Amino acid sequence: MVVSVKVFKKATPNGKVTFYLGRRDFIDHIDYCDPVDGVIVVEPDYLKNRKVFGQLATTYRYGREEDEVMGVKFSKELILCREQIVPMTNPNMEMTPMQEKLVRKLGSNAYPFTFHFPPNSPSSVTLQQEGDDNGKPLGVEYTIRAFVGDSEDDRQHKRSMVSLVIKKLQYAPLNRGQRLPSSLVSKGFTFSNGKISLEVTLDREIYYHGEKTAATVQVSNNSKKSVKSIKCFIVQHTEITMVNAQFSKHVAQLETKEGCPITPGANLTKTFYLIPLAANNKDRHGIALDGHLKDEDVNLASSTMVQEGKSTGDACGIVISYSVRIKLNCGTLGGEMQTDVPFKLLQPAPGTIEKKRSNAMKKMKSIEQHRNVKGYYQDDDDNIVFEDFAKMRMNNVNMAD
């Protein structure tokens, strides 16, 4: 069985410079981050003593584009690194296996490049827009671009510039650990004796996207009140560090009266299952995603991970966390009592069974979708499959229109 390798490509509007990337997602392993490695092909005799420069940039948009009036901007763009790609400043640079294969296939006009993310750079996050909002989405976005000029400070002309949006993601550690997060709260009442105790325990600390979260709820009613119903939520907490704003959204929920009312002196133990999915929150404004909702493989934004010894308060960009929230309805006079149990929602680590299964499903979908699509072709000599970059997203946009 021959395994083909997919390579994404994108050319400048004039077709003279073409980007080739082996992947769109780059992984932050906490202590190091995957480099952005690719190849640029320039048509012969096009440069005429000019050079090709490359940049890795991030755009942090924390306000709506339509609100930018009187010169006020609600976005920041930072150039994280830049370098001259053509002519090569380091002809002896070490290439990855993918770069070696592409250079061998594309010939002498192919030039490899490598960019590195700075330490502690934020992960890619997109905040879902309202249905009628066609402006640029809020969030953190990474772009690599190349342009032709005499120096790095030359004006970038659209005809000779190419840019690609990439994602910087975090994966779960290989070992999910044995810790079972839990929370225990009690509530007393002003005009009656006794308390209601609520204990919530999760079956693990780290969940993968698409997995069920299992919350075991134990209620002990030692008061004179009754518990009328139980509500269970998965809450996504978002912190926008640039403006010090925080908000929370329910990404999964259920309400039940099974086992209720819990009368005075009674106890209840029950396990609730919820699955937080981006597909179930398509029309929810402000939900944080790890990409655009039009992408076929989009997930809810992963929990923000930091190095050991640091807290998420030290992170920059958009900080994401999750919790299971249980609410007990104790009647009109008794009010509600609630508790939150935090957990982490992440991508499965490379090498795990869950990651292999996820990759296999994505590959099957990709093959089926692109079997007869123009712009997607295979080179049998080197087992390389070329796909026009962002074509899938454009197809989805056209279908939506």
Curated annotation (Swiss-Prot):
Primary location: other
Residues modified to Phosphoserine: 366
Gene3D superfamilies: 2.60.40.640, 2.60.40.840
Molecular-function annotations in GO: G protein-coupled receptor binding; opsin binding
Outcome (variant: residue 52 to D): In photoreceptors, leads to an equivalent distribution of per in the nuclei in both day and night ultimately resulting in a decrease in Bdbt foci development
Taxonomy, superkingdom: Eukaryota
Record InterPro entries: Arrestin (IPR000698), Arrestin-like_C (IPR014752), Arrestin-like_N (IPR011021), Arrestin_C-like (IPR011022), Arrestin_CS (IPR017864), Arrestin_N (IPR014753), Ig_E-set (IPR014756)
Biological process according to GO: desensitization of G protein-coupled receptor signaling pathway; G protein-coupled receptor internalization; negative regulation of opsin-mediated signaling pathway; negative regulation of phospholipase C-activating phototransduction signaling pathway; photoreceptor cell maintenance; sensory perception of smell; sensory perception of sound; signal transduction
Processing and modification events after translation: Phosphorylated upon light exposure.
PROSITE patterns according to UniProt: ARRESTINS
Entries under Pfam families matching the protein: Arrestin_C, Arrestin_N
Expression across tissues: Expressed in photoreceptor cells.
Localization, UniProt: Cell projection, Rhabdomere
GO cellular component: cytoplasm; rhabdomere; subrhabdomeral cisterna
Function text: Regulates photoreceptor cell deactivation. Arr1 and Arr2 proteins are mediators of rhodopsin inactivation and are essential for the termination of the phototransduction cascade. Involved in regulating normal cycles of per nuclear accumulation in brain circadian neurons and thus is important for normal circadian behavior. In the dark, functions with Arr1 to promote the formation of cytosolic Bdbt foci, which are required for dco localization to photoreceptor nuclei where it phosphorylates and activates degradation of per.
Family: Belongs to the arrestin family.
Protein name (Swiss-Prot/TrEMBL): Phosrestin-1
Organism: Drosophila melanogaster (Fruit fly)
Gene designation per UniProt: Arr2
